[in-house]
Amino acid sequence: MASDENIGADGEQKPSRPFLRKGQGTARFRMPRNNKTSAGAPPTSELSSASSPSINVPRFSLSNALPNSARTVDSGISNEDETRPPTTASLPMDQPSLSSSPENRLNPAPSVAEEHGHSGQHAEEEEDNDTDEVSAMPSFVPDEPSTLVNSDHELSDDALKYKNAAAEFKAFERRMDSMRSASTITTSLATPSSCAPSNSSEPPTRSTPIMNDLGVGPNNHNWPSSMQELSGISLETPQARPLGSNRINQLVRSEAQTGISLLQHHERPTVTAPLRRNDMMNSSRQNPQNGNVQDENRPEHVYDQPIHVPGSSLDRQKLEIEIRRHRNLNIQLRDTIAHLDYAEESVHTTKRQLEEKISEVNNFKKELIEEFKKCKKGVEEEFEKKFEKIKEDYDELYEKLKRDQRDLERDQKILKKGTGERNKEFTETIATLRDKLRASETKNAQYRQDIRVRDEKLKKKDEEIEKLQKDGNRLKSTLQTLEKRVKQLRTEKERDDKEKEMFAKVAMNRKTSNPVPPVLNQSVPISITSNGPSRHPSSSSLTTFRKPSTSNRERGVSWADEPNEQSLEAVPQEFLMMPVKEMPGKFGKCTIYRDSLGETSKVTDTIANGLLFEYSNGDLRWVNRQNAVNIYISAVDKTVRIDLPTYNISIIHTFQRQVEVLRPGNNITLISIKRREVRTDLIYQNGMYKTEIFNRDGRYVTKDFSNQEVSRKYNPGTHTYRDNQCRYVLVTDYNDFELVEPEFRLRWYQGDPTGLNNQYILKIIGRPECSEKTLRLEVNLSTCEGTLETAEMIGDKRRKTTLFQWKK
């Protein structure tokens, strides 16, 4: 029956669904609801193809083999759609290759367009208001025209031939409507489909017109000779099978709906309509030889009559019924196989879906179990923590209650006792508390002592760490200094080599080799012996390249030459430093000198009748005009050297190492940079050697070759005298001592409590007879920065004037 699923909410007709609904059989096609037509409506056979579509059955060939199962046939259902069963519209069950008839093998049946119509009379008698019509359209209607359905101009000649024949048979059907009253004879074997009682659930159908020659009798048909041959009969796809209680009626209706297969593959005997008695008499009078000739007024097609046909036996009728039964059974078997395949696939799909759902449920169950375990574990841990806390609170409260109870009991006992006993107990309690207090104070004192010891250890460790850091910095600075010194020495060596080569060339060109007169030496600036490099190469070169008087005498020179004749080309003018320009400097007005090698020197006149030389490599030298004081400061290794040529005394300060005081007679005083000791080595005129050492821990040690080492403790303010008490060492403190001598005074003291700014001050006493001022040189031992000043007394006041300063 047709459903209302194609009718929209607004009453409009929706497009029909091209697919079967879930659960419908393969042979149950969609049957549209067919309303009762009006009296003036055209018959069904005359409707257009849009309202009553027809199909073109394709011609089958030997290549179309029977499938193993109905599911393997292309039913037009998408593989992705698992909810729709396959149809049998394209099943090649009726292939002519499987038929036993030789005519079917030679002449395969062409495509036939089949349409079914209704009779208005039977529709009023046998149908209800809602009747279903079986259409030849396949259950699957593709979106685009299929290759199996062709237009009229694309049909073959055979198809057009059979199409015209079908139109003629439709005309015969209309003429046969008047003869239905004659078909009143019925038997228990079969009933014509046109005369069978109608069922409200199934539409009335008509027999399919026979396509064979009407003149061929039943004797000309090739019937199967055995059941094996009968089982091989090819079948065509059936239309919707009606359901009925009578098996014979069901077989007849099924046969009526499989007319295409009967037209295409085999002939069936022509069953004539029953004749009236007068007609039978008239037919018997005719010539029996013309029994096969049809009358023109006789219709070309009549309905099957399940009665005893004259001229045929009962076995032939039974055989025909058996053939139809087997055919219908084969059709039912095919549909059953299709339904079973679809059911199996549905079960498999449902099973897979259920397995997936079960797997998801199991996974969800596992997750819930894990989450439950975690929650349970967390709750247990939280419960244990709360229980422990409650237990601790309970124990604490219980102890407090016990103490309170003891106190109450003690108070009750005290109240029961007398005043004397009470005072006695109070005295004992006070004594006990005092003992506890003393013990606590003792422990606190011990703790303070331990803390003090620990602090001292930490302080020592900090000092050691600081010392190591300073040593590391000093080593780094020394390394840098040595690198710079090596670079400077290489440069000086190259320059000296060039100078030697130049002066050697000059010496080879001399006309005489007499000694240079003293006047030439006086024109050269004074050269002071020091550890620093000489800035006057001319003087060193003159000393180096002086030769004996007979070394460079020319061959052509006679003995009559004057011995005092000499050449002034010994020192060329280009090797002497000549003044270039004058400009103001940071210490006063200065003059810049330059030699032929490109070396420059800056000379500045300072107070105290001195000259300050600033060289291009950063070195500084200060010399007074009397040549009594010569101070040289090296920029590379930060060495400070003070020479007193008049007294033959030198004071050398090596950065981060020590201070040396060199006196005549190889008397040396060494002061370590960390002030660990002050060591003085003395050599007397009689050859006696003596060493005096002032340690930082307050010990005074004397050593010599003849006597044992003597060590004693000295007190601050101690004086040690020598050289008739004109020279001595004044020790004011461990970090403050002074070397007092007639020519100078050198004081070493600690600049701040940390000991990071230790300084020494050298005071050079000026000679009054030479109008010299006292010089004061202050040097920082940590940074090697210093200042040179003049100090003089004006009345009761001391006045200082800065000559120059130097920094890193």
Curated annotation (Swiss-Prot):
Subcellular location, record wording: Cytoplasm, Cytoskeleton, Microtubule organizing center, Centrosome
Biased amino acid composition, Polar residues: 61-78, 85-104, 280-294, 511-529, 542-551
Compositional bias (Acidic residues): 124-133
Comp. bias (Basic and acidic residues): 113-123
GO cellular component, one term: centriole
GO biological process assignments: centriole replication; maintenance of protein location
Keywords from the UniProt entry: Cell cycle, Coiled coil, Cytoplasm, Cytoskeleton, Developmental protein
Bias (Low complexity): 42-54, 530-541
Stretch list, region Disordered: 1-151, 187-206, 271-298, 511-564
Highest taxon of the lineage: Eukaryota
Coiled coil spans: 161-181, 314-503
Subunit structure: Interacts with hyls-1; leading to hyls-1 localization into newly forming centrioles.
Function summary: Required for centrosome duplication. Plays a central role in determining centrosome size.
Protein's name according to its UniProt entry: Spindle assembly abnormal protein 4
Organism, scientific name: Caenorhabditis elegans
